[in-house]
Amino acid sequence: MNTQVLPITPESIALAAKLLQQGELVALPTETVYGIAADARNGEAVKKIFEAKGRPQDNPLIVHICGMEMLQGIVSEVPERAKKLAAAFWPGPLTMVMPRGPEVSDVTCAGLDTVGVRMPSHPVVQQVIRESGVAFAAPSANLSGKPSPTNAPDTLADMDGPLPLILDGGECTVGVESTVVAVTGEHPMLLRPGYVTKEQMEAVLGEEVLVSPAILEKLKDGEVARSPGMKYKHYAPKAQVTILRGDFARYKAYVEQHAAPGVWALCFDGEGAQLPVPFIEYGKNHDGVTQAHHLFTALRDLDKHGAQVVYARCPEQDGVSMAVYNRLIRAAAFRVVTL
């Protein structure tokens, strides 16, 4: 199949809407990362996503909508917590896991009795949903295990062939996938950190948001993934990545000791020139927002440069930085050295 990459025009929006109605795949920009969309109600269409990505089918997908009225049939109930969070953060990079409704395909939900739903803020996604009338399932538009793409060229690098259309909306603003929170049960639970933080949700809800252990640790054998990004190696370049936890002086000393051909540094802005190895900087120290915006592009650039071993500066573990750490520790296959 020849994959077209088209700029955002009324004609390309109409083509994307038509393809989705016909059960085809479309890659398109969101505020978080580029996604591959298919009609969430059409199991055969959704199977094409798993095939295109090489993604295991026990990994659930998120359903995207453009209005609260679209929740009907997708979820069986909208808990009060969900209404509060939607009022505060929708449209935006927040996914809520709710009881599943009858219209969502089993394939979309990986057979679970819950479904993750979000209302993206990106105008292109909203236009495509409105014009197609399709609530679509959409994971990130990368081959499974690789860093998520935040622009159309990186999307094409992974998806040239398996789908007919990529809409080019430029760079994504956030740079990491949406926050995922389960809003049923005794307490809300953060399943995947993102741009909407634990602290922000607690301020809206007036109660504690628990943090799933799987955010910072591997899932245990036999444990079910309730959200994308909880299972399998994710976000990884070809190089072996190790996170070095400690201040810059100790980081620099460790990198100097282990410098060799093929070794690269993934560091914060302004640090690379002080290191004896090639480097890529991925945002300001203590600034999770800039780190999130640059992380996936930095990981893909390491592949383009042929890096074999990467020593990464360790982000913090609160606010948006928790999302950066969550993605980076999976890219590193949980290799962390405390200095």
What are these model-derived regions, one by one?
Residues 1-339:
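Active-site-adjacent structural elements in enzyme catalytic cores
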